[in-house]
Amino acid sequence: SRVKKLARQAEKLDEKGRELFIHDFIVNNVKYDKLKKEYSHEIIGALGNGVAVCEGIAKAVKLLCDELGIWCIVALSEANPEKGIKYRHAWNVVRIDGTYYHLDATFDNTLSKDDTIRYDYVNLADKQIFRDHEPVIWKVPACTDNDHFYYRVKKVSWTTVDEVRNRTRQAVKKNKILLFHWRGGYLTKEVLKELLDVFHEEAKAKEKQAYVSVNWPQAVLRVRFKEGVGEELLEMEE
């Protein structure tokens, strides 16, 4: 079957590698279905038709995790019309190296663009995920650890403005996209302004412009640098 064929590509990887294989497969091959067709709520939508909503994606992630020997369940949260959240939302809780984490491939799917795969929602603790997810309807295991949080593992979770400045300088010089997680306390408006100043100063020094996207609840920033000077762009990601 397609699932077995897919799983075969990842069976030699370690547990974290298998998890990332599943995440990246979803991000690269499944389109979020804004029309919400019936099959988009099922595994066939994600794995058969390449389109799905959160429920279909979460079910597909669970199926692939089952196939690759990763403990996984589907988590479900209630809608909250007062906050403008019209629908329930589904994602996954996985167990990696014996520890429980939240994994939301749907949210990363909608954030990933320009060939940049996003990992903002890979291996989050409760206190991170519930910044922008409603409480779960059915109990899931407590996720209290963030040692396997993707950006932390990859050492792109930074705590000082100086570190951000050094990395920004390198990114401008090499013409690379800068993608990182801010861990130096809360990402307040004041901190964000300080970081924006850094991006713009370093870009301007090389006659470039900084285009910044911010996932505010998760404190993840993505910065592109382009030639020329003009309007700086700041986008709040949803």
Which ranges hold each PLM region?
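Generic solvent-exposed, charged/amphipathic alpha-helical segments
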Residues: 23-27, 62, 193-196, 200
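Secondary-structure boundary elements
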Residues: 1-46
